[in-house]
């Protein structure tokens, strides 16, 4: 492939990702294909978002790291010291992607570190490694462009998470605001008793203890269920099994109790 063809292939990652869930594995595969190197996309906290290996490394520690999808904390923190692309780092470097305990097997191993930056903050790191042949200027151009594309997708994913969190919170607030005073009181007692995200409720017992009618409890649960905040299932004489579907619900309920 020519440099132009390789650049277009990276550009296609961005076009294909539009409107879809971000697939960092596919991105890593593409970068491995065009740069011909092992590719690891690592978040700022060391989570392995995606990887692809042109040359699998036979090392138990590396295999475990890939299985757990987590880079060591010390190594992840050290990457923050790399503020710009650092290329062709030898196996003796603290940033090497090769296992240092087997350094004698990878004496010609070379690593390139590309910081992933977006929105003025460090989002992660693109780590490339291969044996023998140096990373050329063309490779580094592709790596930095690839890092930019990955950074854009990380920002996109973060924006979606923020939007989803805002939606979840808004749904909960609307559901709670639809409750009458007595229904809200009933809900507070119900989840005090459940003491968690799910459990068995006997409505009549709570009604008797708190001094409210059973219908108030039923209406309150129905409103929350119709809003998609909880799921409830009747178990007959045993009571009603309740499960919280929206993680923001218990947080908002706790805020109300503390006000």
Swiss-Prot record:
InterPro entries assigned: CodY, GAF-like_dom_sf, GTP_trans_reg_CodY_C, Transc_reg_CodY_N, WH-like_DNA-bd_sf, WH_DNA-bd_sf
Gene Ontology biological-process annotations: regulation of DNA-templated transcription
Ranges annotated as DNA-binding: 203-222
Molecular-function GO term, any one: GTP binding
Gene Ontology CC entries for this record: cytoplasm; protein-DNA complex
Localization in the cell: Cytoplasm
Keyword Electron transport in record: no
Pfam families: CodY, HTH_CodY
Domain of life: Bacteria
Region annotation (GAF domain) ranges: 1-155
SUPFAM superfamilies: Winged helix' DNA-binding domain (SSF46785)
Stretch forming the signal peptide: none
Keywords on record: Cytoplasm, DNA-binding, Repressor, Transcription, Transcription regulation
UniProt keyword DNA-binding present: yes
Role, per record: DNA-binding global transcriptional regulator which is involved in the adaptive response to starvation and acts by directly or indirectly controlling the expression of numerous genes in response to nutrient availability. During rapid exponential growth, CodY is highly active and represses genes whose products allow adaptation to nutrient depletion.
Family recorded in the similarity comment: Belongs to the CodY family.
Listed name of the protein: Global transcriptional regulator CodY
UniProt source species: Listeria monocytogenes serovar 1/2a (strain ATCC BAA-679 / EGD-e)
